[in-house]
Amino acid sequence: MAIAKEFLLTVLNYIANGVVNVQSSTTQAVTTLAPYQIIAIMKNNNVTVSRTTITSISVSDVVNASQEETLTIRYSGTDASPFTYTTDEIEIWASTQSALLYKIADIQLQTPLSKTEHDYLNIEYEIIITAGASYTTTSSMSQYTSVVTFRTLVAPILYFFALFLVPAWSTVLKQNPTFPQSQLSNYISPSSYQGINAMYVGSNQVTIVSKLVGFGTTTVSIVVNGEVTSTQVNAPIFIGVTTPSGVLVLAYNYYSGTISKYVSLTVTTTYGSATVINQFETKTTGGTT
């Protein structure tokens, strides 16, 4: 059961670059990729045999004692169509009201399932997303520059994954004020979000040179490259988004040496054979040790 590369590329591109604005001399439009609904597509030998809408989406959001935040999203749906078919693969897609957007997951069945016109096919799929302690914003960052702080620990980067997995994510947060993620509602506006635009080494602001999103055989990554000279030692390197209340920190890592010119921070997550998107990793390079 594989999390799709297309989904991760969609999320990380949005985190890095924000919404896509399309303008001409006569029109202006904003491309919105957040789903209106979730669709399950049944296939057999790579040919679509049926599809159904996911009718139930449940979400939980908790932070454990190790300062890791975990989102659990469970999709449930039923194909009650009056069709007879065999399926060996089920794909989970984000969709508008009329068109597919991006594939979320691909479920290869160990044994093909056969459905008659009198049968119901029940579908359940769970995604668990964990962000480690390098993603939960702490008040200690405020000693370096003005950053957004929260009443409880939260990993802002998870907001964006849920945005592309849960229809009407903003509404879900309003209905669940005890979720740690609900604290982000005042700081992120999905329709106007412009991507990562802040990078610091301790109290030194970094000039962002490039933001790259790419993939390998098993991973998708954001790489933010910057230019700065810093003599601070053991200072955090962090990236985020500027808000009227300070920087909303999305990821950070500590670097033990000084930095003479260039710095880079990488956020990586894995696609492949698991229903769990692996804990994020940060890698920091640049400067001298």
Swiss-Prot record:
Ranges facing Cytoplasmic side: 174-234
UniProt superkingdom: Viruses
Keyword set, alphabetical order: Host membrane, Membrane, Transmembrane, Transmembrane helix
Membrane-crossing segments per the record: 153-173, 235-255
Ribonucleoprotein keyword on record: no
Compartments reported by the entry: Host membrane
Positions on the Extracellular side per record topology: 1-152, 256-289
One GO CC annotation: host cell membrane
Membrane protein topology class: Multi-pass membrane protein
Protein name: Putative transmembrane protein ORF289
Source organism of this protein record: Acidianus filamentous virus 2 (isolate Italy/Pozzuoli)
Phylogenetic classification of the source organism: Viruses, Adnaviria, Zilligvirae, Taleaviricota, Tokiviricetes
